[in-house]
């Protein structure tokens, strides 16, 4: 296991202000509102798309969105590595100019990746005789709208690293409110293309604001010339960490997106993929809320690791887990007692979700809670090697289970059951790794003896 405890001061003293050691109240309020907005926006998008698009067109946009999220395969965990480096410098009261330049290079790379992918999407749709140029433009803009999330998530990691999480969450709140307003406006006649153009313009404004703030805090460098050189230097310097965190990032996004490729192939477009989208919209929405709760604990967790304060590390992690339990209990209760009404309201006449999906989704939500709490602690403590091994193992198991499900001729509901079983096993393994890794590492300099390189700085990795 490769912990990052040494990249934070090993002899750091505990923070004097106890309140600063746990959770920021302004961050708590903002993060709850933006996470709730993210969950609501996902449901609203599905609800509106199901009503303004024909089922076959709706299923195509679902597939294009899944392909867009698949570009996160190019993330390779770069944002997490930048977080570790910038956070270490910030806690030491310093500015890491090299890390700032490389952060700029990574952000530019992500923006260019989104733009290039959207142009490819436009071109592929434009050559199909069944689509007009306007249709192709819509698909390209939607692809760009989806893939810019990769840039935005990286900006979030950089903001948290330098304690600018409140500013970031204000921008996130603006984004959620603006996007939800334009989505709902389609119900009263706003053209679909206008929604896409407006949403991407909003993206441009928000990304510009976030970058400006990070530049002022020294977390990014005010230069674009030579960004390719800085990007290559970042890859060369952090090759081992990228290989490990990248393995996790690849397997993680694969686990979440590969059903969108399996279902159209094995079960067809139309109702099957719409059922998958409705199920995963709730599943991924819960992930956003869980991530928000876990983000609240990151400043306290990293300070606890720096001070080797295991008690504080456990307290902040348990607080995050408790916060996750609140929305989980609400969502599970809603599904158990009103899933039929919920899915009918969400999808209208586009598709009908079988009632047997409900218990499977409840299991997925609970497993996701365990996974997100453990994974967040491992990631932000720098334990990339172990999470990459677990992620790779879960991905391989998922492929094998899917192959068996397809050969056996299982239904889409049975396929979702197999997915939930493998996913739950991976979540439990991550929980064990979180205890054996960062918690033991914080308890004692020798507490994580099994992780041989726990004292190696992030830059050397």
Report the location of each language-model feature.
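Interhelical loop/hinge segments that connect adjacent transmembrane helices in multipass membrane
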Residues: 2-24, 193-200, 210-256, 300, ...
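Interfacial segments at transmembrane-helix termini and the short loops linking adjacent helices
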Residues: 20, 125-142, 270, 311, ...
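Membrane-water interface segments that mark the loop-to-transmembrane alpha-helix transition
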Residues: 26-38, 64, 72-125, 308-332, ...
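Transmembrane helical elements of multi-pass membrane transporters/channels
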Residues: 26-46, 172-179, 199-220, 229-299, ...
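Small-residue hotspots at the loop-to-helix junctions and early N-terminal turns
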Residues: 58-62, 66, 139, 270-281, ...
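Helix-loop junctions and terminal segments of transmembrane helices
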Residues: 76-92, 161, 220-221, 283-308, ...
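Hydrophobic alpha-helical transmembrane segments
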Residues: 140, 169-220, 393-397, 411-436
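Membrane-interface junctions at transmembrane-helix termini in multi-pass inner-membrane proteins
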Residues: 148-174, 363-393
């Amino acid at each position: 296991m490769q912990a990052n405890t040494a990249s934070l001061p090993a002899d750091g003293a505990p923070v004097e202000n106890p309140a600063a050691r746990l959770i920021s109240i302004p961050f708590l309020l903002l993060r709850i509102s933006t996470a709730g907005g993210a969950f609501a926006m996902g449901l609203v998008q599905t609800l509106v798309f199901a009503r303004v698009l024909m089922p076959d067109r709706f299923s195509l946009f679902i597939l294009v969105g899944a392909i867009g999220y698949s570009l996160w395969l190019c993330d390779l965990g770069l944002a997490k590595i930048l977080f570790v480096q910038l956070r270490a410098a910030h806690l030491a009261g310093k500015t890491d100019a090299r890390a700032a330049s490389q952060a700029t290079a990574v952000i530019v790379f992500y923006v260019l990746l989104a733009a290039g992918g959207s142009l490819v999407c436009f071109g592929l749709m434009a050559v199909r005789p069944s689509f007009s140029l306007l249709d192709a433009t819509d698909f390209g803009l939607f692809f760009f709208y989806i893939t810019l999330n990769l840039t935005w998530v990286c900006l979030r990691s950089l903001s948290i690293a330098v304690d600018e999480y409140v500013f970031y969450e204000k921008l996130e709140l603006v984004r959620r409110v603006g996007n939800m307003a334009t989505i709902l406006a389609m119900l009263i006649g706003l053209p679909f293309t206008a929604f896409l153009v407006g949403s991407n313009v909003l993206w441009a404004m928000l990304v510009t604001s976030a970058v400006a703030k990070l530049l002022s805090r020294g977390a990014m460098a005010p230069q674009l010339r030579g960004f390719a050189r800085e990007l290559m230097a970042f890859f060369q310097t952090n090759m081992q960490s990228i290989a490990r965190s990248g393995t996790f990032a690849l397997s993680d996004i694969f686990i979440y997106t590969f059903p969108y490729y399996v279902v159209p192939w094995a079960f067809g477009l139309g109702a099957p993929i719409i059922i998958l989208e409705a199920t995963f919209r709730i599943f991924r929405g819960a992930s956003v809320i869980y991530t928000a709760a876990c983000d609240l604990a990151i400043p306290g967790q990293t300070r606890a690791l720096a001070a080797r304060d295991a008690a504080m590390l456990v307290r902040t992690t348990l607080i995050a887990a408790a916060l996750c339990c609140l929305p989980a209990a609400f969502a599970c209760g809603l599904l158990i007692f009103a899933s039929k009404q919920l899915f009918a309201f969400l999808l209208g006449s586009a598709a009908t979700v079988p009632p047997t999906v409900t218990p499977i989704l409840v299991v997925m939500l609970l497993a996701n809670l365990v996974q997100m709490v453990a994974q967040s602690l491992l990631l932000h403590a720098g334990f990339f090697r172990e999470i990459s091994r677990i992620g790779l193992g879960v991905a391989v198991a998922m492929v094998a289970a899917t192959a068996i499900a397809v050969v056996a001729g299982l239904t889409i509901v049975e396929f979702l059951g197999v997915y939930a079983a493998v996913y739950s096993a991976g979540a439990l393994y991550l929980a064990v790794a979180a205890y054996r890794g960062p918690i033991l590492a914080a308890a004692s300099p020798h507490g994580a003896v099994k992780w041989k390189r726990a004292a190696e700085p992030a830059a050397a990795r």
